[in-house]
Amino acid sequence: MSLTLDDFDYLLPPELIAQAPLAERCASRLLVLDGERLDDRGFCDLPELVQPGDLLVFNDTRVIHARLYGTKETGGHIEVLIERAIGPHEALAQVRASKSPRAGSRLRLADAFDVTVLGRVGEFFHLRFPDSHDVLDLLEHHGKLPLPPYIDRSADEHDESRYQTVYARERGSVAAPTAGLHFDQPMLAELAKKGVHGAWLTLHVGAGTFQPVRVNDLGEHRMHRERYVIPQETVAAIAATRAAGRRVIAVGTTSLRALEGAAQDGPLEAGTGETELFILPGYRFQVVDALITNFHLPKSTLLMLVSAFAGLEPMRRAYTHAVGHSYRFFSYGDAMFITHRNDAI
């Protein structure tokens, strides 16, 4: 089947794009897609949808204060969005300015410290931060939380907690693994009491997750790279779950991408790596049996991923249903629970 970008388009009324979180994390709705069947549930019903011995794999990345404002040596205003730290004193970043800064120039950020532009690495600027402080510490104190571009407001104090998962630990993402935002501590305790297991990995979400696909021929698209760490304990938990005949359930597309990316060249192994895996309908999943995920943007690589997981036509029906029933979309929106179809196309 030859697919183009237009195969992943849908009409979304702007008022369905959630601009703020609900009062309670688990108060969101949950659209269950199992084969051809759709079921409208609440996220609080999740314990009824999983079985003792099932394994939930969470991404414990933490969103950093990746957005900074400042000036060039000429006095021109700039906006910097850190893509990733590449050491204690260096980072790759997007820089928005009327004129791109030159290699060797200095930028004054947050009216607090200077960075040096070392050059370009692909689409990003390579920045050198002061030796006196770690990059992530400087961002924590002087940066701002980077809300997604479809949320048309600035981050506030409420977002500092609600745009993080309750289990976020490892600093490094510029966007939240949003499927995890629905879990609160009582929900995690209820799942554990039922005998549902949890495991952890880390995948740091880059700004590339918001970049649109710019080619209609999907074979020409090149995915952005994202870093992951999969502990040995998680690999062992997955093996034990499979041996017991239970399901591996990825909490979010980031967890799925890390697991499937790490299993591309053979059996899943613990370790650190990078993935640029582009998942389209026809992809054969190696590790994940079910997926918890939010609703994704039209024509996005994440919509392509979930369409590969459930089947393109079932996913189209699910999104048509979600729009028709006024589900809330994107980062602060509602969620889906999707069972993988081995015959998905």
Swiss-Prot record:
| Pathway named in the protein's UniProt entry | tRNA modification; tRNA-queuosine biosynthesis
Chief location bin: cytoplasm
Q: Which reaction does it catalyse?
A: 7-aminomethyl-7-carbaguanosine(34) in tRNA + S-adenosyl-L-methionine = epoxyqueuosine(34) in tRNA + adenine + L-methionine + 2 H(+)
Q: Where in the cell is it found?
A: Cytoplasm
Keyword tags? Cytoplasm, Queuosine biosynthesis, S-adenosyl-L-methionine, Transferase
Give GO cellular component annotations, separated by semicolons.
cytoplasm
The enzyme's E.C. designation: 2.4.99.17
Keyword Acetylation attributed: no
Which terms under GO biological process does the entry name?
queuosine biosynthetic process; tRNA wobble guanine modification
Q: Which InterPro entries match?
A: QueA, QueA_dom1, QueA_dom2, QueA_sf
**What is this enzyme's class at the first EC digit?**
transferase
Chain segments annotated as coiled-coil in the UniProt record: none
The record, for Pfam families, names:
Queuosine_synth
Q: Does the keyword Lipid metabolism apply?
A: no
Q: What does this protein do?
A: Transfers and isomerizes the ribose moiety from AdoMet to the 7-aminomethyl group of 7-deazaguanine (preQ1-tRNA) to give epoxyqueuosine (oQ-tRNA).
Please describe the quaternary structure of this protein: Monomer.
- HAMAP family in the record: QueA
Family (UniProt): Belongs to the QueA family.
Q: Which NCBIfam families does the record associate with it?
A: PRK00147.1 (NF001140), queA (TIGR00113)
Q: Which PANTHER family match?
A: S-ADENOSYLMETHIONINE:TRNA RIBOSYLTRANSFERASE-ISOMERASE (PTHR30307:SF0)
Name of the protein? S-adenosylmethionine:tRNA ribosyltransferase-isomerase
Species assigned in the record: Aromatoleum aromaticum (strain DSM 19018 / LMG 30748 / EbN1)
Organism lineage reads as: Bacteria, Pseudomonadati, Pseudomonadota, Betaproteobacteria, Rhodocyclales
